[in-house]
Amino acid sequence: KKYPDFTVLSKKLSSLYGADLTSSLSKHGESQVIKISVSGLDDRYSLDDVSIAKELSELLCSVIFEPNVKDGAFIESELEQERRQLLDVIDSEFNEKRIYAMGQLIKHMCKDEVFGIKRYGTAEKIKAATAESLCKAWQNLLKTAKFEILYIGDSPADKAKEVFAKAFANIERNVVTSSTDVVKNVSKEKHITEEMELSQSKLVMGFRT
């Protein structure tokens, strides 16, 4: 809410001596990992004894805990922009047949397992998502997800700790622990063939041990 568009956010980052804000999404086993990080100047180099660590922590908490939400929903125009970008990523993976073949292997081999779900989900799920449903998912994530906070730098982490402690104090947490279901045996082998016009075929094999 404090930084409703990229222009305002860029100005804030520039005011913090060119700080950098990044995010990424990945899968580690059966867990989906969302990483949001901010990096900037060490406190000892700032002017007027301003705590850059505190400012960066407040910025990060603002992004995580106070996104652009209105009437219980994300901003529709921003949602559509992100939806298009995500669908483009999925399309690009289809065009890269090596990545696509590996994805299809995991999809069919782990059909009824959490591990079989792609990190971005499916195009159908992305198209069906609404501003309201995503807002509810974000609220649920804040309550149930496991958070790991890493602070790296020469300056003391005290001020950063205070910022995050204050942010989490307003949330009723009920962390859900994930478990791994290992399926070692299968009753029958699967053979999946997809026919396409390609100059080079892709063969992928999966084994359980």
What are these regions (language model features)?
Residues K1, K146, R173-T209:
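His/Glu-based metal-binding/catalytic segments typifying zinc-dependent metallopeptidases
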Residues V8-V176:
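Charge-rich, well-structured scaffold segments of protease-associated domains
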Residues K1-T7:
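Short intrinsically disordered, low-complexity coil segments enriched in acidic
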Residues Y3, Y120-A123, I192:
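A generic, residue-level signal for flexible/boundary positions that often mark functional hotspots
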